[in-house]
Amino acid sequence: MIIVNVIITLFYPPATDIIIEISFGGIKMEYVKLTEDKLDEFIRLRINQLREEGATEDIDLVPALKDYYNRHMADGTFVSWLAVDGEKIIGTSGMSFVERPPYFSCPSGKTGILSSMYTDPDYRRMGIAKELLSRVVEEARNYGCGSVQITASDMGVLLYTDFGFVKNGNFMQYKF
């Protein structure tokens, strides 16, 4: 699997906090923000996403994910929009907010880190990921972020480039 790092400058049209219902092909879908009552299912889907991307499971990630999401949802530094068909979560998104020292292309120092973009295989190619992406990017804009960053999976590259993300050739990472 090839992982590509991309970055976007925020300019996409706004999304709203209003729940939107869409019906097509027997599917009645809603877009809603993640709340604590849906967190266990969200975490299950996050782990499915990581498996699908080829991650090696050598630890139980559930406790760490639950701790992370609880802390960062509470302090406002993580937000997620979900696509829901009835009671079933069929698509997820996530945006974490970090702050770094300001620099010329990002004077606020605030950056969005996009994660948890996942759509149930039975619901792919219906525009769900694009709608979720537009909502979390708007959350980043509203937070004051100057950019959004992501490490894109093979499957996500087309979605992100069509949306306006561009590769950032200077990105490097040091792993412990």
Predicted regions and their residues:
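A short beta-loop-alpha structural element at the N-terminal edge
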Residues: E30-R44
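Conserved GNAT-fold acetyl-CoA-binding loop/helix
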Residues: I47-Y69
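A short helix-loop-beta-strand connector motif used in the catalytic cores of GNAT acetyltransferases and
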Residues: N70-L82
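Conserved beta-strand in the GNAT
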Residues: L82, K88-F97, I113, Y118
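Conserved catalytic-core motifs of GNAT/GCN5-like acyltransferases
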Residues: F97-P102, Q149-T151, M155-V157, T161, ...
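Conserved acetyl-CoA binding element of GNAT-fold acetyltransferases
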Residues: S105-P121, N170-Q173
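Conserved acetyl-CoA pyrophosphate-binding loop and the N-cap/start of the following alpha-helix
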Residues: Y123, G127-R135
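Conserved GNAT acetyl-CoA-binding A-motif
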Residues: A140-A152
